[in-house]
């Protein structure tokens, strides 16, 4: 019989800050892969605060997740745009930029795209 597992993003196994103190990603690891909680502050923009870490022109992570609070705008490399807010579930393919809208931090749970997100390239 399989055992239950309990982990908390309030006690993460790993935390990764983004540039200029504009947020962080907290991670717990499960058999299916890492689950992350991203918290980005007002003024955060992927191309300003994660691009220097990722060293790619746009975010190349696939994201599958749920917005807890705040708002974010995502623009794909091909120009497609979407905004996400509290209660929204989303799937975002690789090749995008994103930024926080408004004056509230953006908090997002992601169970697909966090394995290498905001992880310095060696």
Name each region found by the language model:
Residues 1-39, 47:
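A short, N-terminal "cap"/entry segment at the start of jelly-roll beta-barrel domains
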Residues 2-11, 99-122:
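Double-stranded beta-helix
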Residues 31-36, 42, 63, 68-70, ...:
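A generic structural signal for short beta-strands and their flanking turns/coil linkers
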Residues 36, 80-82, 107:
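Short beta-strand segments
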Residues 37-58:
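Conserved short histidine dyad/triad with adjacent acidic residue
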Residues 45-46, 70-75, 98:
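Short beta-strand segments in beta-sandwich/barrel cores
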Residues 52-78:
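Glycine- and acidic-residue-biased ligand/ion/polar-headgroup-sensing regions
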Residues 76-95:
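Short acidic-glycine-tyrosine-enriched beta hairpin
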């Amino acid at each position: 019989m399989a055992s239950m597992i309990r982990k908390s993003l309030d006690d993460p196994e790993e935390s990764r800050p983004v540039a200029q103190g504009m947020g962080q990603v907290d991670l717990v690891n499960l058999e299916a892969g890492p689950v992350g909680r991203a918290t980005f502050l007002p003024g955060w923009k992927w191309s300003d605060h994660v691009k220097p870490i990722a060293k790619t022109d746009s975010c190349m992570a696939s994201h599958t997740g749920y917005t807890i609070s705040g708002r974010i705008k995502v623009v794909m490399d091909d120009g497609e745009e979407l905004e996400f807010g509290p209660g929204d579930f989303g799937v975002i393919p690789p090749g995008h930029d994103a930024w926080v809208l408004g004056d509230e931090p953006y908090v997002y749970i992601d169970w697909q795209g966090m394995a290498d997100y905001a992880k310095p390239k060696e």
